[in-house]
Regions:
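A short alpha/beta connector and helix-capping loop motif
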Residues: 179-189
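Beta-strand secondary-structure signal
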Residues: 17, 113-115, 184-186
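Active-site region of the double-stranded beta-helix
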Residues: 58-90, 97-112, 118-123
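Short beta-strand His + acidic residue motifs that chelate non-heme Fe in jelly-roll/DSBH
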Residues: 102-105, 171-178
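Catalytic core of non-heme Fe(II) oxygenases with the double-stranded beta-helix
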Residues: 94-164, 191-203
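Non-heme Fe(II)/2-oxoglutarate
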Residues: 1-81, 203-208
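Short conserved micro-motifs at the rims of enzyme active sites and ligand-binding pockets
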Residues: 27-29, 176, 196-199
C-alpha cells in the first residue's frame, strides 16, 4: 500500500517578511546617523532617545513601506469585519555593537510589532523568536528541528529586511558577531475603531 500523509499546522504564529528593495536616501541616512549620537544604554545595547523616530519628515518613505506591510498583516492575518484603522504608536532605533546583544522581551500595549533592518549583516545578524509555551511533557532529543518540535526559531536578517509579528511573541538578539554596528528600527502598532460585537457583549470603540 502506498499511503500518503499530510501535516497541518493549527493556530500558527504569523511572521511577515519583506524587503524595501532600495538603498537608503541621503535624508534617511542622516536621520539614522543623528540618532546614533543621541541614544542611551539599553539592556545589552543602545536605543535612540527619540521614541517616535517615524514621525520625522525624513522617515516618510519608510512609513509608506512599513504601512504596506501592516496592511498586508491586517488583511491576511487579522481579517477584521468592522472598520478598524491600524497605526504606528512608537518607533525607535536600536544600535548593537560587536559583542553586545538585545535582551529577551515582548512588546506590551501593542497588537503588531515590527523591525526594519537599517544595517545588518545577513551572515551574522539574526532575530530569534521563542515559543510561548515551552513546556514539554516528554522531551525527545531530535535528529532535526522543525516548526513543530522547536522551542525557538531564528531568521537571518540583512539591510532593508522587514519583520512583522504579534507583539506578544518573545524575541531577542544573541551576542553580536561580525564587524558592523547593527542598526534596526523597531515599532509598535495599535488599532482604533470598532472591535468586538454588541450581540456577543464584546463591543468596544477604541479612540486615539
Amino acid at each position: 500500500m502506498n499511503s500518503q500523509f499530510t501535516i497541518d499546522g493549527l493556530f500558527p504564529t504569523p511572521i511577515i517578511s519583506s524587503n524595501i528593495n532600495r538603498s537608503w536616501t541621503e535624508k534617511e541616512l542622516a536621520l539614522f546617523d543623528y540618532h546614533k549620537d543621541h541614544c542611551h544604554n539599553n539592556m545589552g545595547n543602545t536605543t535612540s532617545n527619540d521614541r517616535y523616530v517615524l514621525n520625522a519628515p525624513e522617515a516618510k518613505g519608510l512609513v509608506g513601506f512599513i504601512g504596506q506591510g501592516i496592511q498586508h498583516y491586517v488583511d491576511k492575518i487579522i481579517c477584521p469585519k468592522n472598520p478598524v484603522e491600524f497605526y504606528i504608536t512608537q518607533s525607535w532605533l536600536n544600535y548593537t555593537k560587536p559583542g553586545e546583544y538585545h535582551h529577551t522581551h515582548e512588546h506590551p500595549n501593542s497588537i503588531i510589532s515590527g523591525v526594519l533592518y537599517i544595517d545588518a549583516d545577513r551572515d551574522h545578524d539574526k532575530i530569534i523568536f521563542h515559543k510561548a509555551n515551552r513546556y514539554q511533557q516528554i522531551k525527545f532529543p531530535q535528529t532535526e528541528f522543525n516548526y513543530f518540535n522547536s522551542e525557538s526559531w531564528f531568521f537571518n536578517v540583512g539591510n532593508g529586511d522587514l519583520k512583522l509579528f504579534p507583539s506578544s511573541l518573545t524575541h531577542n538578539v544573541e551576542q553580536k558577531k561580525g564587524d558592523n554596528v547593527r542598526c534596526s528600527l523597531a515599532f509598535n502598532v495599535f488599532a482604533k475603531g470598532y472591535i468586538g460585537a454588541e450581540e456577543e457583549l464584546t463591543a468596544l470603540h477604541l479612540r486615539m
